[in-house]
């Protein structure tokens, strides 16, 4: 039993859905990419040349290739992910220029096993056929990612200020307004504007507890030391620039690294703290006294506290991360990269996750020809990427805990550390990115099939109701009367 009012509502709903589907099927889908940086540029590379898509790329920066990183450090999975984007992306590292970071020697920094080598990465079998860390200059790499995207589609100096979600009957479901007053209509928005940007709150809501980054309870001091000074303070064993290695000292609650990099010995010291750090402060002041207290537990021969006290500018950087997000999508708006899962320096695996996000989104959106396809693509993206990126986040965090001797039943025992680090390496390399990509495609196809089946049922029902249009017209004035179908 239906009232004429309910039938009319159903008819309007069906007409709206049909109009919406037709409006997106009859034209290119407008894909807005916002934020700039590694994930955004890689997604632009993945989508370029797709005849079904009109890609528009917006970067808040004046330069389309800016980054807060002086260098990118890519783990082996980055090479695999880029190869799955397309052939051009697969060769981008070679064309950009790169060099391998010196392989690590992990050493116990204190206690009865002090100076015992835990793991020498150079002695391990390279099962990935890529360096432990590939170092790339961000600017030429991002240029490679944006290469081939028409300049008319690239929009620097565009800061997003609002997103208006339109009625389903609208030609475009999204209206993006920028700080300069310009407006872009779009079918879907994919954004990565960093851990403190707007995209995360657009997806989760401004008041969601997982919206803002959180302090990981580690602070780090960074020092760039002239090689001669580093050699005097660290000694020949650790400070000799000709060794071609980087050294990591594991302490109880502290960790110290030194490596010869671009003409300087770069030294990094991190320590655990339970202080209530104010994340509105991007750095905080430290003192010789504090650094000495934090790092004097390490072998005195290292002189790590003297290096950090004398060359760090007495500034500490908080290690921050995102709490797990319950979703990466909200309607036709999705977040990726550092907006979705910012990871600390300890985790080291953030760049690979940014590129994996773009690889999956690019694969899915390339095959989208309607708004319904886009919705299915975003659903598949969220389904596969959230568990994967969160696993990587926790996996990388475990490495940080191992570095600082804070894993229960491992501590700073050299044999236990070696076993745990080898297991960490094995787990990192075991993930199959091709299978990950195929699973995303499978989920998208299945979602489209299920939703199109439901749509056909509604369409048939509407056809039946359409036959009674004359009856509706005859009984317009009796809107409260029941009509039995």
Curated annotation (Swiss-Prot):
EC class (word): oxidoreductase
Q: Does the keyword Oxidoreductase apply?
A: yes
Glycan attachment positions:
126, 147, 157
Q: Which SUPFAM superfamilies match?
A: FAD/NAD(P)-binding domain (SSF51905)
Disulfide bridges in this chain:
none
Q: Kindly indicate whether the keyword Ubl conjugation belongs to this entry.
A: no
Any coiled-coil regions, as ranges:
none
Q: Tell me the Gene Ontology biological-process terms attached to this UniProt entry.
A: secondary metabolite biosynthetic process
Q: What does this protein do?
A: FAD-dependent monooxygenase; part of the gene cluster that mediates the biosynthesis of elsinochrome C, a perelyenequinone phytotoxin structurally similar to cercosporin. The first step of elsinochrome C biosynthesis is performed by the polyketide synthase elcA which catalyzes the formation of nor-toralactone.
According to its UniProt record, which protein family does this protein belong to?
Belongs to the paxM FAD-dependent monooxygenase family.
Q: What is this protein identified as?
A: FAD-dependent monooxygenase elcH
Report the source organism: Phaeosphaeria nodorum (strain SN15 / ATCC MYA-4574 / FGSC 10173) (Glume blotch fungus)
């Amino acid at each position: 039993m239906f009232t004429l009012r309910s039938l009319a509502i159903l008819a309007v709903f069906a007409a709206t859905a049909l109009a919406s589907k037709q409006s997106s099927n009859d034209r290119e889908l407008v894909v807005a990419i916002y934020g700039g940086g590694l994930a955004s540029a890689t997604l632009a590379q993945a989508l370029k040349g797709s005849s079904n898509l009109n890609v528009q790329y917006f970067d808040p920066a004046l330069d389309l290739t800016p980054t807060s990183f002086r260098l990118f450090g890519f783990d082996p999975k980055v090479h695999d992910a880029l190869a799955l984007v397309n052939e051009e992306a697969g060769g981008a590292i070679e064309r950009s220029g790169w060099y391998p970071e010196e392989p690590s020697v992990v050493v116990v920094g204190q206690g009865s096993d002090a100076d015992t080598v835990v793991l020498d990465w150079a002695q391990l079998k390279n099962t990935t056929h890529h360096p432990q860390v590939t170092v790339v200059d961000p600017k030429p790499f991002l240029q490679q990612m944006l290469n081939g995207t028409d300049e008319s589609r690239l929009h620097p100096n565009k800061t997003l200020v609002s997103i208006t979600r339109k009625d389903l009957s609208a030609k475009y479901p999204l209206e993006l307004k920028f700080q300069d007053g310009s407006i872009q209509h779009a079918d879907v928005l994919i954004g990565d504007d960093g851990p403190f940007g707007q995209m995360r709150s657009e997806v989760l809501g401004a008041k969601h507890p997982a919206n803002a980054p959180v302090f990981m309870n580690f602070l780090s001091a960074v020092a760039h030391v002239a090689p001669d000074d580093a050699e005097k303070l660290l000694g020949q064993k650790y400070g000799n620039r000709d060794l071609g290695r980087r050294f990591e000292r594991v302490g109880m609650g502290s960790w110290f690294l030194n490596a010869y990099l671009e003409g300087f010995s770069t030294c990094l010291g991190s320590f655990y703290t339970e202080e209530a750090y104010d994340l509105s402060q991007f750095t905080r002041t430290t003192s010789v006294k504090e650094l000495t207290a934090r790092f004097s537990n390490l072998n005195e021969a290292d002189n790590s506290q003297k290096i950090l006290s004398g060359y760090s500018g007495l500034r500490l950087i908080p290690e921050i991360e995102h709490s797990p997000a319950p979703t990466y999508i909200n309607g036709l708006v999705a977040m990726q990269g550092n907006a979705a899962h910012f990871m600390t320096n300890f985790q080291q695996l953030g760049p690979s996750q940014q590129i994996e996000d773009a690889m999956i989104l690019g694969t899915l959106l390339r095959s989208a020809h309607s708004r319904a396809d886009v919705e299915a693509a975003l659903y598949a993206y969220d389904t596969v990427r959230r568990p994967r990126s969160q696993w990587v986040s926790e996996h990388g965090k475990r490495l940080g805990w191992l570095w600082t001797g804070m894993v229960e039943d491992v501590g700073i025992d050299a044999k236990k550390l070696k076993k745990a680090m080898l297991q960490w390496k094995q787990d990192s390399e075991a993930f199959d990115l091709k299978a990950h990509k195929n699973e995303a495609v499978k989920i998208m196809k299945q979602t489209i099939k299920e939703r199109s089946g439901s749509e056909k049922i509604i369409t048939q029902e509407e056809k039946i109701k359409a036959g009674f249009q004359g009856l509706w017209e005859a009984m317009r004035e009796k809107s409260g009367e029941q009509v039995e179908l």
